[in-house]
A protein has these predicted regions:
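Short coil turns that delineate tetratricopeptide repeat
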Residues: 44-47, 81, 115
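Start-of-helix register in tetratricopeptide repeats
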Residues: 14, 48-51, 85
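Canonical positions in the second alpha-helix
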Residues: 39, 75-76, 109-110
């Protein structure tokens, strides 16, 4: 068990999310991602984890983990195909990773959803 896991084990899921949100707001993106990874590993099948999944994807992007952001954005879109923010994050993460053909396909998906990238 990692330090973060042991620290979070006694907290309620919402407390873990709130703490991750504070870390994100403080630009501690890697730590926020670690807390959210723990939260989703423990409670990912619970209803209402969409905000945590989105914050996780958002945490990966500025922490220079574009492919993890891509994977998270795709997971969000599997659950919620109309999530405009996830489409934008997918496009930008693919661009950042140098995956121009995939980014172009994601841009077409964004246009189909009426999302301006």
């Amino acid at each position: 068990m990692t330090h973060i896991e042991s620290m979070l084990a006694s907290r309620e899921p919402y407390e873990v999310y709130q703490w991750a949100r504070e870390l994100f707001d403080g630009r501690e993106y890697i730590e926020a991602a670690q807390a959210l990874e723990y939260l989703l590993a423990e409670h990912g099948d619970t209803m209402g984890t969409g905000a945590a999944r989105e914050l996780l994807a958002r945490s990966y992007y500025p922490s220079a983990q574009p492919m993890r952001a891509v994977d998270s954005a795709r997971e969000i879109l599997e659950r919620d195909p109309g999530n405009a923010y996830a489409v934008i994050l997918l496009v930008r993460s693919l661009q950042r990773a140098g995956r121009t053909k995939e980014a172009a396909a994601a841009e077409r998906m964004a246009l189909a959803l009426g999302v301006e990238v």
